[in-house]
């Protein structure tokens, strides 16, 4: 049986290194998490939230799914948003997509993928409502545009949740950001920001 010993060894080396540099790190971490940020991103293994924004464990609360989709029937995602806003009292929600996203590629294709097609329906709707913006573009430009448009659409969905609307009505300091990440160069790009003063 493969027990993934190499990963356990990696963990031990990592924990030892952290303690050598900061002996109280895990003691502090075990007290309570108090992140200022909620990151909602893609499940893609190349897009690791903490590393991309260079934050330590405990500094960012993370939720990931295929193609960073936020829909009002996904109680997993909604529960994460509610906990982050109401219990952790995060100040920022970051919706981060990325170029060359496999979920976005699949949504652009015209063949069946199985159960994931139900999830990709939300992205296909973005295409359907913006058909004219994709006319005349080659496949790569369509893909990049859809990756960006999907981020903006999901930011709108976050802003329209009852959780965020309630927070804004209560005067809570909460800003929702839409970013996109380039796997080719490791750089984030800002696309959109909304707060309680925005009209979404």
Indicate where each model-derived feature is located:
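Short beta-strand segments
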Residues: 40-42, 64, 94-98, 177-182
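Divalent-metal-activated hydrolytic enzyme cores
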Residues: 1-35, 67-91, 102-200
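N-terminal short beta-loop-beta anion/metal-coordinating cradle
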Residues: 18-59
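Active-site cofactor/substrate anionic-group-binding motifs, chiefly glycine-
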Residues: 46-80
